[in-house]
Amino acid sequence: MQTLEGGALRLSRRHMLRGLALTSAALVLPGHRAVAAPGPRQDPETTWRAFVTGLPKAELHMHVEGVVDPWLAFELAERNGLRLAHASPAAFARTLTFDSLESFLRGYGQMLDVLRTGEDFHDATLTYLERARAENVLYAELHFDPQAHVNRGIAFEEVVDGIRSACASAERDLGIGSRLIMALQRDLDVESARAVYASALARRDDIVGLGLDNYEEPGFPAKFEALFREAAAEGFRLTSHCDLEVPDSVEHVRGCIELLGVDRLDHGYSVVESEALTALCRARGIGLTACPTTDWNHPDPLEDYYVAAVTRSVGRMLELGLRVSLNTDDPGLMGGRYLTDVMVDTRRALDLGIDELVTLSRNAFESTWAPEEERRGWLAALDAYVDDRAPAVPG
């Protein structure tokens, strides 16, 4: 596999994050126990944040394209000779206010446009993995949208090589594992999906699963049923976005489970509206990857209507015993908020305790598509961390 490490852009923020990832005393690797350095007495929220930062975590729902924030967008645009329609990164950030899936996807398209080369994909991926590792994320499954790039003339292989090169570097240097999920766009025709699926078959060792995202068209599960059944027969794991407050959302969840045979649901909040679907998700152990994320223009995320709605759903999923986890979705677009921020805000909104936070992290590890041996190691690290750190956290 072609590597891009030697020519990769060295971003100033990257060196800072690498230092955090390699030196933070809060980080825990499987087989090690957490050691908390003594310090001054902290207020409860600071103590909670420290606990969540060091908590061993996995992330199952983030998009490589969504890692690009306004500052990285300007750096990549300059490297690629592009001119952005904003005076500065801060001015760009002020435009990233989302009140619908459509407004979000417009912002997403602007970030996507600056990704032009394998080196760009490498740098975006490594930016995420370094930041995630600094927050003790031990493993991540990274979504990428090849149709959006192939349709712009970028080769499938260049995209995958760039992402995989960063994943290999991060695993070697930082100890964070990762695998790829190829997302297909629900609003494009099946022939387009089949074209990139054929490319994915040739990279079977690099891509663990298939998903569906982008605009949620009516009846989309039936549209992709045949392709998903073929993918399952080839050994791919399966997921699909099922978004909040769209028409027929409950039926889409049902179709994803019954027609597509998904192992996980990305978002999937409507499952709590149906006792039958709730029971089905519990029986099949289907993971639900919740993303209570906001934009750059909400100083307090809990004041965002979307965050409030998703957070309520997360609380209900926990009550119902569903395998729900917390995720960042698109941290570059979503106010630069990574997994610690999301977990801390969810704890604050729902008044969660240690048991619920550990359950969310455990659900994430148990929902991964990694080998059982790897999962056992991460869960052991989680248990060791809780044994060491839980007594110091406010009740």
Q: Residues of each region from the PLM?
A:
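N-terminal secretory signal peptides
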Residues: 1-12, 24-26, 35
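Short linear motifs in intrinsically disordered/low-complexity regions
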Residues: 6-7, 33, 384, 388
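N-terminal export leaders
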Residues: 13-17
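Sec-dependent signal peptide recognition
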Residues: 18-22
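Hydrophobic alpha-helical segments of integral membrane proteins
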Residues: 28-30
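Signal peptide processing junction and immediate N-terminal pro/mature segment
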Residues: 32-38
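Metal-cofactor-binding active-site regions of metalloenzymes
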Residues: 39-238, 244-251, 255-264, 270-287, ...
